[in-house]
Amino acid sequence: LDVVDRWRNEREAGTRLTFAIHAGGTTVGGAELQPRGETAELAWWLYAGHRGSGHATRAARLLVEHAFSDLGVRRVEAKVDPRNVSSQRVATRSGLRREGVRRLEPGMAERDDATGMVVYARLISDPPISEPEGFRALLNSFLPRKRAISQLLVRDHDGRVLICRLTYKRDWDLPGGVVEVGESPQLAASREVQEELALDLLAGPLLLTDWLPPWGGWDDAVCLVFDGGAHDAGIADQIRKQAREIREAEFATLEQVRERCADFTARRIESALSNAESGGGPAYVESGG
């Protein structure tokens, strides 16, 4: 009842604009806009038996244009339950770009069991989705994105591999890190090694692509291992550790790698090392191989 009273008061005050969706001579659903300054929140619903025919998409498109042209807002947004796949399609087809997921505690949304809402929005300055630039930007907002990690396989002339003990986990790993948005993975490997170890090493050819399944709170990722070349063991004396991330760094035998690294990391190092020594093309493995 409190919700109904609030909606009634908002309608009377003009802060909640409700519209009926008509099709084929009957009312098939509704939609509403809630202007708040330069932003308006958009919502829609369809009655059973009238879904899947494009009615909600057309209504949403019309209300977005109405908000921009008649209400003076500069941003229209919609919050959609991530379990509601059809409403997510409506948001996308009406030209709203996916911006992210707003996390919620149970009881904070209209459905008490919702733990998040997907935020979609369109700005008045966004190119129309009828234009190539606008359509590409729309697709780019919701298509899957996969994290990329670049690492460098650095060896000495005895076949040992440079590994690091990190501050944020117990096991050792190859030097490297997450590729920044828009950054070349090959350049990222060299950048990370310079930042973490103060070594200026060029990343050579790709040795291994390793898909990492979700693990320990991380989403899945792709790890790219590049050839860092073979060097004199004395290069380790030039290392200046980035204390925030690196505890130790040293050359290790394969036996030491197996003892110090997680099993999948050890498998990845062995796969990359085998490929570097054989001179074969880059290999693909999953969880180290």
Where do the language-model regions lie?
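A short, internal acetyl-CoA/4′-phosphopantetheine-binding micro-motif in the GNAT/acyltransferase core
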Residues: 20-22, 43-56, 80-81, 178-181
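Conserved GNAT acetyl-CoA-binding A-motif
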Residues: 69-79
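Conserved acetyl-CoA-binding loop-helix of GNAT-fold acetyltransferases
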Residues: 46, 52-69, 85-93, 185-190
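Unchanged
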Residues: 179-202, 210-265
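Conserved Nudix-box catalytic region and its N-terminal flanking loop in Nudix hydrolases
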Residues: 81, 156-195
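Acidic, metal-coordinating catalytic segment for phosphate/diphosphate chemistry
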Residues: 119-153
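Nudix hydrolase/Nudix homology domain
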Residues: 170-171, 242-289
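Conserved catalytic-core motifs of GNAT/GCN5-like acyltransferases
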Residues: 79, 95-117
